[in-house]
Amino acid sequence: MSEKPAFVSVQQSLRKSFDAIEPLHEEWNNTLLECNPHLTSLSNLAEQLQACQRVLFKKTPLSSFINLQEHLRFKLQAAMEFNLEILNQKLSTLQRIRDSVSQVVGSVLYMYETSIEKIGLEAILERSSLCPSIADMLEWLQDIEKHYRNQYLQRKLLLQVCGGHLSDIQALPQSWAKQRDAASSKQQHVEDILLSVSFFRMST
């Protein structure tokens, strides 16, 4: 392995970047899990609100309760807004993670671009059983950044689309799960990358 100062500096930057990304990756996964109960609650409340709007209370024994239908509708809408607010807070967390990953990757790429002439192509492509090549790791970092960027956008769009349509809100848990399943291979790719650089990160 090359021991040029520029080469070592880029390796150190790569090591720090993966060290920074691993806890962000864990926080991302935990945040998505924390969304699930609120997605389910929001869906159930939307179903109840839709039923409340369809029923003619005047033709039921409940007609003796003045403004009951309006009161129930208000309570359900307030509960939906509460859950939607929490989901938007979770979305803000995902945005922060996405931005943090982009900043980490951007910093490494900048160091690489300013050092490439000093390192040389041969050293950039050099790898060992314990240390992936700089080229490989840079590509992996860009894959990770792209994954978070795309996933954040998809989650944001799902919450925006369901804004005023009860049927879309009811289907939100299923839509969210479909998005998760569609991205499962990319998610696994991130896991594999972190595993592939585990020995490299422990080396000095």
From Swiss-Prot:
Pfam families hit by this protein: CA109-like
Keywords: Cytoplasm, Nucleus, Ribosome biogenesis
Cellular component terms (Gene Ontology): cytoplasm; nucleus
Domain of life the protein comes from: Eukaryota
Gene Ontology BP terms: ribosomal large subunit biogenesis
Localization of this protein: Nucleus; Cytoplasm
Subunit structure of this chain's protein: Part of the 55LCC heterohexameric ATPase complex. Does not associate with pre-60S ribosomal particles.
Described purpose of this protein according to its UniProt entry: Part of the 55LCC heterohexameric ATPase complex which is chromatin-associated and promotes replisome proteostasis to maintain replication fork progression and genome stability. Required for replication fork progression, sister chromatid cohesion, and chromosome stability. The ATPase activity is specifically enhanced by replication fork DNA and is coupled to cysteine protease-dependent cleavage of replisome substrates in response to replication fork damage.
PANTHER family noted in UniProt: AFG2-INTERACTING RIBOSOME MATURATION FACTOR, SIMILAR TO HYPOTHETICAL PROTEIN FLJ20508
Protein's name according to its UniProt entry: AFG2-interacting ribosome maturation factor
Organism: Xenopus tropicalis
Top-level taxonomy: Eukaryota, Metazoa, Chordata, Craniata, Vertebrata
